[in-house]
Amino acid sequence: MSAKGQMLQDPFLNILRKEHVPVSIYLVNGIKLQGQIESFDQYVVLLKNTVTQMVYKHAISTVVPARPVQVPHEHPAPAAGTAEI
């Protein structure tokens, strides 16, 4: 996975984990899983509901939080001669 992918993915999953936000995880085969993210690493997400499931990231299509979350991220500095919107 690219470094940029990790820069987006890790803060998003981490805020969901820290704030115990309920999530729906859609797999590439269309199955919907629900629960809270207990932990994650480069390859898997541990999803806790009545049981804890290990879900491989390559099988995940979409992660949908039950409520809006604010993901901390750094904004790159605007290029010289451009205005920030």
Swiss-Prot record:
Keywords: RNA-binding, Stress response. This is RNA-binding protein Hfq. Belongs to the Hfq family. InterPro entries: Hfq, LSM_dom_sf, Sm. Residues 10-69 form the Sm domain. GO terms for biological process: regulation of DNA-templated transcription; regulation of RNA stability; regulation of translation, ncRNA-mediated. HAMAP family: Hfq. GO terms for cellular component: cytosol. Pfam families: Hfq.
